[in-house]
Amino acid sequence: MERAFIEWYPRGYGVAFKIKKKIYEKLSKYQKIEVYETEGFGRLLALDGTVQLVTLGERSYHEPLVHPAMLAHPKPKRVLVIGGGDGGTVREVLQHDVDEVIMVEIDEDVIMVSKDLIKIDNGLLEAMLNGKHEKAKLTIGDGFEFIKNNRGFDVIIADSTDPVGPAKVLFSEEFYRYVYDALNNPGIYVTQAGSVYLFTDELISAYKEMKKVFDRVYYYSFPVIGYASPWAFLVGVKGDIDFTKIDRERAKKLQLEYYDPLMHETLFQMPKYIRETLQRL
């Protein structure tokens, strides 16, 4: 019988990968970490049974998470990444002319596994762990606690697990208020928000909470390899930024595989019933 890794979503929906072998498994202080060699998508990183990425396709997540916000902001110089222990989000941020990017990851084991076995970070994680990267800094700790006590960010990116379970606090009004205070004016906050079809209630709830806090709130989706796509993202704006418009000249300098200015125009095409529900909030 062929071996497979299956992630089960609500209502009995599953995403499966045929696997060659399990490479790694560990129960860290926070979660179960697994790495598999898949048949057609490279290595798969899973946390508590949920797919975080497959190495042949991870850019379909990291690019739409990072670049729309970075290109919509007029001058993003200081960036905070909450989560993102695999290094992919920081890697994409550093394609831009930033002065500093700080990554706050609660689970150091995720960083070590990603550095040694996933290797999508172009050596960033090693440099960050040793404090030797000129622009990218690392803090091992709770992103919620960090953001309570730190200010002055142009862009804040939440690269967290799905909006259920332990990460649910990162989709609360309380957290969003700390984020708003931590942003410069103008500033942009972006977070992944789960499967459009399977986490619809969580998406609507998070959108409603963000509307209480931010000056403008946007939603968009993107087809992500390895996830129950389309995958939702939420954006909160502090100040006067039109997230639907990006700097196309800056975009030309980026090395991109999935997201680009042409794709940006399609980001906001949510299914009709979800679009109408969010517009009523």
From Swiss-Prot:
It is found in: Cytoplasm. The keyword Transferase applies. Pfam families: Spermine_synt_N (PF17284), Spermine_synth (PF01564). One of its GO terms (biological process) is spermidine biosynthetic process. Its EC number is 2.5.1.23, 2.5.1.-, 2.5.1.104, 2.5.1.16. Residues 6-238 form the PABS domain. It catalyses: cadaverine + S-adenosyl 3-(methylsulfanyl)propylamine = aminopropylcadaverine + S-methyl-5'-thioadenosine + H(+); S-adenosyl 3-(methylsulfanyl)propylamine + agmatine = N(1)-(3-aminopropyl)agmatine + S-methyl-5'-thioadenosine + H(+); S-adenosyl 3-(methylsulfanyl)propylamine + putrescine = S-methyl-5'-thioadenosine + spermidine + H(+); S-adenosyl 3-(methylsulfanyl)propylamine + propane-1,3-diamine = norspermidine + S-methyl-5'-thioadenosine + H(+). Spermidine binds at residues 62, 86, 159-162. Induction: At temperatures higher than 95 degrees Celsius or by oxidative shock. Homodimer. NCBIfam families: PRK00811.1, speE. This is Polyamine aminopropyltransferase. It comes from Pyrococcus furiosus (strain ATCC 43587 / DSM 3638 / JCM 8422 / Vc1).
